[in-house]
Amino acid sequence: MAIAYGMLSCHIQDDKVYDPQPHKDEKYRHRNRRSTIEPLLQIYDALFSHYGDLHWWPGENPYEIMVGAILTQNTAWTNVEKAIARLAEDLTPQRIAAMPVETLEERIRPAGFFRQKARYLKAMTAWYARYNYDAEAVRRVPLDALRPEILSVKGIGKETADSILLYAFGLPSFVVDAYTMRHFARYPLKAGRTYAAVQAYCEARLPESAEIYNHFHALIVINGKEHCKKRPICAGCPLEGGCEKRIEE
């Protein structure tokens, strides 16, 4: 489903952004004026116009996405795919829970850090068992309670937790990664330099929509891989017109 600037701007009324599902805290209900929103939406619009509709996250079901979110820590997605392929028909929470940790380590070896990741997968699976491996039961938990709960699981940090919330369960928790930090520092948006600050900046300026967060993060990642690298390739970048890195060169 295509979501471009027009769809995002439809949430702007009388120079304010209205949440489709208002937050309990009044300060999140009537957010920032159009002038503070437009730079972020301009980035989204430029990326969307260039790359189109991207479909993320790769995975067949919520549990597979959760596994992928852990396996992708400190490695390339190609290595994750190799590890997932080695799990094959055993990639279910029931089978991972029953699998000896040594066997699991060997299966996920291509993903790197396989010993610690095997224990992280065991811990995550044990957490999921509390919900009888039922994704709908997880989704019924309020987000402000669910996120700290997931963060308490061994091996799950903020980026992994938000990836699980957003991609596995379809909940509106904006994912901040190295690509996001790099884009926002170079554009720049003055969003801050910490994970929490950047996440709050984005969530305060975008409609509270998992679909929009999903699309935006996917667009940032693909542009980060193609253009906004540590050593950027600015020619052809859809954001080069407003990028400080480009201006400085």
Each PLM stretch: what is its role?
Residues 2-4, 22:
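Ala/Thr-enriched low-complexity intrinsically disordered regions
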